[in-house]
Amino acid sequence: MNSGVRMVTRSRSRATRIASEGCREELAPREAAAEGRKSHRPVRHPRRTQKTHVAYEAANGEEGEDAEPLKVPVWEPQNWQQQLANIRIMRSKKDAPVDQLGAEHCYDASASPKVRRYQVLLSLMLSSQTKDQVTAGAMQRLRARGLTVESILQTDDDTLGRLIYPVGFWRNKVKYIKQTTAILQQRYEGDIPASVAELVALPGVGPKMAHLAMAVAWGTISGIAVDTHVHRIANRLRWTKKMTKTPEETRKNLEEWLPRVLWSEVNGLLVGFGQQICLPVHPRCQACLNKALCPAAQDL
């Protein structure tokens, strides 16, 4: 009787242990439940299986056990490093208008940081479709009257127009300057926004101005500032996958491949190059070190 109880108890214990450990291909030989007797069940040997490794492309952002990340080659233009090195040589004197009259040279260095940032933004708003010399002249006249948020809001439109004339589209810029300045006073306590998204939301402020404002006013490189010079030269050198129609399209193309460490340099470098050698009309190809490397040289 006692032997029967032991057999039932051990049998239940074995079943419980199997259930708790999960399904297995086979169990090790066990002692029989009866005292001193070996189990008469035949011992099963494990089947030898060979692993099959299947390579597949992971879907929906999931990676398989044997899947490796797919490497997508990054497009980059031919000879761009040599072209850039040549432009650096041609710009080594830093004697282009942008080098003396750019946005980083138009503010009052003795003013408070908030006022300096405001003056940087205004100089960028004035610079659109305007030569650097004309922008610098307008900024000098504005600064002579005390260029602050408060002074601009107190200046009537006619007077402001006379001060900034002859910058391009000066009538529209009078309106944009007044509207933007009012927004800065109401929403930003007289300072300028510290993000590209907020800057481009201001009247008269485009992507190029916003990225330059972030760099000059805030010391942050948020993107490549592309104006007409950078847009023109990037297309002539084939620094874009295809010919682009707008500066903003050019910016997106450049940022896809140009190393970020060069983003802050490329604007001033190409703007000055475009002012002195790679001119919009009748470029000075004979004086350009990239004459043999420029795809557009033979067409200009």
UniProtKB/Swiss-Prot annotation:
UniProt cross-references to PROSITE patterns, sorted A to Z: ENDONUCLEASE_III_2 (PS01155)
Protein modification: Ubiquitinated by TRIM26; leading to proteasomal degradation.
SUPFAM superfamilies in the cross-refs: DNA-glycosylase
Keyword flag Ubl conjugation: yes
Expression sites (tissue/organ): Widely expressed.
Subcellular location: Nucleus; Mitochondrion
Catalyzed reaction equations: 2'-deoxyribonucleotide-(2'-deoxyribose 5'-phosphate)-2'-deoxyribonucleotide-DNA = a 3'-end 2'-deoxyribonucleotide-(2,3-dehydro-2,3-deoxyribose 5'-phosphate)-DNA + a 5'-end 5'-phospho-2'-deoxyribonucleoside-DNA + H(+)
UniProt-listed GO biological process terms: base-excision repair, AP site formation; DNA repair; nucleotide-excision repair
Biased composition (Basic and acidic residues): 22-37
Disulfide feature: none
Record Pfam families: HHH, HhH-GPD
Transit peptide interval: 1-19
Keywords: 4Fe-4S, DNA damage, DNA repair, Glycosidase, Hydrolase, Iron, Iron-sulfur, Lyase, Metal-binding, Mitochondrion, Nucleus, Transit peptide, Ubl conjugation
Keyword Electron transport: no
Function: Bifunctional DNA N-glycosylase with associated apurinic/apyrimidinic (AP) lyase function that catalyzes the first step in base excision repair (BER), the primary repair pathway for the repair of oxidative DNA damage. The DNA N-glycosylase activity releases the damaged DNA base from DNA by cleaving the N-glycosidic bond, leaving an AP site. The AP lyase activity cleaves the phosphodiester bond 3' to the AP site by a beta-elimination. Primarily recognizes and repairs oxidative base damage of pyrimidines.
Assembly behavior: Interacts with YBX1. Interacts with ERCC5/XPG; the interaction stimulates NTHL1 activity and NTHL1 binding to its DNA substrate.
Protein name (database record): Endonuclease III-like protein 1
Gene: Nthl1
